[in-house]
Amino acid sequence: MISAMKLPLLATTIAGSLPKPTWLAEPEKLWAPWKLEGRALDDGKRDAVRLVLAMQEKAGIDIVSDGEQTRRHFVNGYMERLEGIDFKNLKTVRIRNRYDANVPRVVGPVSRPAPVHSEDVKFLRSATDRAIKFTLPGPMTMVDTLYDEHYGSREKLAMAFAAILNQEARELAALGVDTIQFDEPAFNVYFDEVRDWGVAALERAREGLACKTAVHICYGYGIEANIVWKKSLGNEWRQYEQTFPLLARSSIDQVSLECANSRVPIELIGLLEGKDVLVGAIDVATTRVESAEDVARVIRAALKHVPKERLFPCTNCGMVPLARDVAAGKLAALGAGAALVRRELV
């Protein structure tokens, strides 16, 4: 682990996924099947990680990740390695309380027969000398991405997942991960559950971790269902107002959120007193590539509510649905925009 390394002021990072090479999976598509098999697939995934690391380093990203190149999906890529979940006989259910999806079924006690991402992290750690971040799905979002036929309680299932995630996270931290992020888009939808057991499940997942821990809560990928949903939310998006006070009292170190080109009142980030704030300064729902000044504008606004030492410019969400050149341009803007404000502060 190199978390003790000196990071610059306004250290940049990304929220999640990056586009996959066209030879690995169909581009600009969620859940795209692999184009390779066996050893060729293993090699292809590692080559893809090398590419996205180079993309991030060229853009000046300070805390890098594997861009989720080894997984087809940020939730199912983990759950498909667990026992007790049937991926063959799917069930159509409403997820995130806004669109229908064919999801796997929980048919027995969930368990993790073997580490899921240890080999991925070993390679990632060996491939860069920068601080690294690794993402895992959060317990509530896992529960919301399947159909339960065994536990009969979303809370009980979430706690079972949290225990599994904690085992995984401890192993990844020991392998040198500097930040482990739990992705919880479901926190922006099920506010009563967040209060009643969602934060508790998140706390269980991060229990005993020595590395930095983060939670990512956003308004989703730039897909049609999310775009339509966001249009229904009115002139101000105040969902964070219900979750941020709870997270401010939690043991989670960092909160990653959506700000760029959104209707989130920027002052809501002030509710995260004492936490690092990963402010989304890149809009992932458009192919327009931001300028450095666009990014700098978001950062300057955020600095009115968060101390500079606690602000980390980031992307709003993952970018796997975007073309690689668009994603590369956006990363470059993120790095340049942070550098611009950094110079203004010294």
Where in the sequence are the language-model features?
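Domain-level signal for soluble alpha/beta catalytic cores
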Residues: 1-346
